[in-house]
Each structure stands twice: as structure tokens, then as C-alpha cells.
């Protein structure tokens, strides 16, 4: 598919220190905190000037919300929204007021069995601090050690904190199950595949509603047998009415290991709801939604494009910019550190969420809300998502992201990506949720007792 070239200056954008190839994308995020990059939470003093807007923004999606602190490069600010502002921006607040909180639903998240060290903390302590800081109910957290071994140590890095706190902020009544996977899950495609398949088995055995996977690798990383094993596991999830949401990745049109252009698994599998990234602009006072654009820092961006492994699924038939092959992502949400939700780490330090691994648990939480509203687990939601998006309620149920692109530099060469536009696009999918409309529609669109086939 022809792509309009994007003209961009030489990259000079600052990204969070220590970003790693995708499985648990924020594992080195404490380096940023230790460097003094932090954000203040609700009730902070006067707002600081926003970072310069990227070309094409209207007022900048990174409008200041709280006064930002930085010991990093001059004039670089990290700005954060509170969970309450996120709830308003994405239409969750009205659902919470009527008791749709995710109560009774279980969201499963695979996380590495981290070894204790200076870059890790206790997730229970962090969740408790998060709840106190932002007035949330106590989180219901379980840690499953089956895959990593009963004696596996568990301490949280910033990725684990991000996954759990975002789900808890959006679906505060849902139960959180952290499934520990072996620390070597990042080292090979075989180990990654085993970790994902094992997590899905654990979710099925616990009758979980949703699996939220923040890890990804480019399709070229996997052998055919591993792709097949992943697909079998995902089919089992669908058969047991478990929704799987996965991050599309943080490297635009290339994979985490660099060129060539490719999309990433598991998000590219048609049985997965793939989540891309945006930069959110919301009211600094009320949290009211003002707009979004494609997340892009020039060296990191919302990953998206077209699969080389999976043909176009039936639910994407007739979608204008999808050709013969599966298009990714399906949906998107905030992934930009300069427009992020504040997270609590190390018992009280606040830092910004970042990456499509922030969008993924948000969408997992939205599905959990819809599960509760429906009174049953929705399972494979992609056909319902596409049916709603292609119907008359699209612009009420979704925020259509129509500006920006996912071109990236690697390391100094520009890889031209895809522009966002009206409707579905390979930068932000259908866009981000307006949950107060989308959740009831999802609850109505799906049916209990069987798969809505692709």
C-alpha cells in the first residue's frame, strides 16, 4: 500500500532512559526515576509550560497538567494525569458511578520473575501507595508462580507496576492476577512462546476474563512452529471466552530488533486485540477529553502495519486501508510519557506510564468493565469491536485519531510509516475508547455460550 512520505527533522527527541526491546518494556524505567525524572500528582502547584508540540498538533497533545520535575536535559518535562482524569478522558467515570467497576472479573498479566535488586520494589506496597494517593479501593492482587516455580522470587519492576496500576485505575473492582513467567522469557522465541502459552493456560484454569500482554516481538523472530503454537493457545483462549489484549509495540513500522518493516506477535494474530499508542490531550482541570494524535517521539512510535503471516480476517473485510493481510493495531490509547497517567513506584515515587504497554492494560480493563456489564465473559471481542466501529455509533464509542504517523528513525535512517486518518488506520487502529458508550455496546454485541467467529 503506498504511503505518503513524512518529512521530519533530524531526531532530537528525548526518550526515557533505559528503554529495552519489548517483553516488559519499562523494566529499566527506574533509571529515569533515579535520574530525577518524576511527576507530581493531583493537587500539585501551578502548571509548567508544555513541551514543544510536534508539527501538526493543535495546541500540543502534551499540554501541561501538573508542574513537572526533571534533572534530565534542560527544558524536558514529564507531565502526568491523575487516574481520575484518565477515567474522565476515556469515559470510564460514568460507568464507575453506576457500579460498573470490573467487579467479579479477573485480569491476568504475565510478568518476569525478577531477581531482587536496586531496580525493583514490592508491587503490593506500590499498589497500596497508589490506592492511598488517588483514593482508589484496595487492589485485589494475586501472584501465580506455577510457570516460574514456587520458589521464584517476585519483586516488581516498573513494567509490572504499570500493568497492574493502569488496570486498577480503570477497573478498580477487577481482581489482578500476576502470572510469573521465567526470567529467560525474553531470550528466545521459544521461551517467549512458552511463557505466553503458559499464561493463557493459567488464565483459562482460573476462569479469567482478560489476559493483558505487554510483550511483543517482530513476526520474523518466530519459527513457523512457534507461530502455530501461539495460535493454538490463542484459539484455546477464545474457546474458553478469555479476551487476549496485546501491545502492538513501540517501534513504529519496524520491530523491536530493527528493520525490516514488520508487525509484532502476539498482536498480529487475528485472535488478539492489538493495542497501539496515542498522545492524549485532556483538560488540566476536569480531565475532559480534548483530542489525541499518534504517539511518536521519532525514535519510538505506535507500532502498526500489515502481517506477513496472517491473511486478513473476516472482521477486517471491507475496512478501507486493510489489504490482503491482517492489519495492526485494532485500537489504541495513551502511550506518550509527556501525556501519561501518574504511576506509583518504590512506595511513593511518581513517574509516567509510557508505551503501548500502557495502552494494553487500559484496553484490558475496558473489556473487564464490559464483561461485568454483560454478565458474562466476552471472549474474542474483535468482531464486536469492528462491528461497532463500522456502525453509526463509531464516533460516540471511539475517539477517532486522525493526525500523526508511525515513522521512526533507526538509528538515524528514517523508516517511513503510516499516517493516521479517518476510521481504521495502521497507526492507531480505530482509535481510543469512549467507554461510557463503548462498554454497553460491547456488552450488547457479544453473546454468551460461544465464539463470535472471525
Residue ranges and their predicted role:
Residues 451-454:
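Ser/Thr/Gly/Pro-rich low-complexity, disordered linker/stalk segments of secreted
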Residues 2-48:
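Secretory targeting and sorting signals
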Residues 10, 20, 318-319, 371-426:
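An often Trp-containing, charged/polar helix-loop segment at the C-terminal end
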Residues 48-274, 303-355, 360, 371, ...:
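Substrate-binding/charge-relay-adjacent region of secreted/lumenal peptidase catalytic domains
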Residues 281-287:
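Short acidic, Gly/Pro-enriched loop/turn segments at secondary-structure junctions
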Residues 366:
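Walker A/P-loop NTP-binding active-site region of P-loop NTPases
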Residues 278:
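A short beta-strand-to-loop transition that corresponds to the Sensor-1 phosphate-sensing loop
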Residues 291-309:
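Extended ligand-binding clefts on enzyme/binding-domain cores
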